[in-house]
């Protein structure tokens, strides 16, 4: 007579769940909980009820519309400038090496580690009203007023952001350009292809993933940049981060500040979603 022993159920392994629980607790504490407080404060009206009263108040404000347009304009032109300048400099450093090119590459890497206010401080010393350039021009040509005054305008903010964020385009782009097979470039040159055609048909397709990655990062950072605009003190240039600061710190209107911050978060997520959509359409892995 044979005995049929019941199969023992394997013991439930809780270790993977514990490893998953720890990062979830960290995210909930450092991200989701503060975000939920911002959302609650933004949606709570003056009467204490949850609604869209503050949202309608913010959207109808001309100051908010101007800040939104300024934010998008600065982000677009700064990102375009970073892509253009970063592409040109990367092509030169990778394909046209010259004495000192390695040093320049290391300086570019160092720029990433520098705080943004340090770059704007250097801009103030060079292009400011009492800076080196204006001081030299006023002493040479006897100008009564500083002839160079673009720094305290939107153009100055865009130029400063291009200087700060261009290395974020150059680092992945230079790494991608170094992976291109040099034999393809030599074959194209032997066949008489124009350098612009070589760039468009050989180099650009290989560099597209790096360009999109660097460009999307620049777009997100310039959209949320606060220190450069604040430190330069550009006249009439109000952005969404600056408006959050002024509403919360200067006016103590925390409800409106939280609503603008929430809109800024949605804007950033929307821009990132557009990047992911464009990356999937072009076959770029992100």
Swiss-Prot record:
Record-annotated membrane-spanning stretches: 19-39, 76-96, 111-131, 150-170, 202-222, 254-274
A Pfam family hit: BPD_transp_1
The UniProt record lists the keyword Transcription regulation: no
GO cellular component, one term: plasma membrane
GO biological process, one term: transmembrane transport
Keywords, ordered alphabetically: Cell inner membrane, Cell membrane, Membrane, Transmembrane, Transmembrane helix, Transport
Membrane-protein topology: Multi-pass membrane protein
Subcellular location: Cell inner membrane
Segments forming domain ABC transmembrane type-1: 68-275
InterPro entries to which the protein is assigned, alphabetical: AminoethylPonate_ABC_perm-PhnU, MetI-like, MetI-like_sf
Keyword Transmembrane helix: yes
Origin: domain of life: Bacteria
Induction info: Induced when inorganic phosphate is limiting; this is controlled by PhoB.
Additional information: Maps to a phosphate-starvation-inducible locus previously known as PsiC.
Its job: Probably part of the PhnSTUV complex (TC 3.A.1.11.5) involved in 2-aminoethylphosphonate import. Probably responsible for the translocation of the substrate across the membrane.
Family of this protein: Belongs to the binding-protein-dependent transport system permease family.
Protein name, per record: Putative 2-aminoethylphosphonate transport system permease protein PhnU
Organism this protein belongs to: Salmonella typhimurium (strain LT2 / SGSC1412 / ATCC 700720)
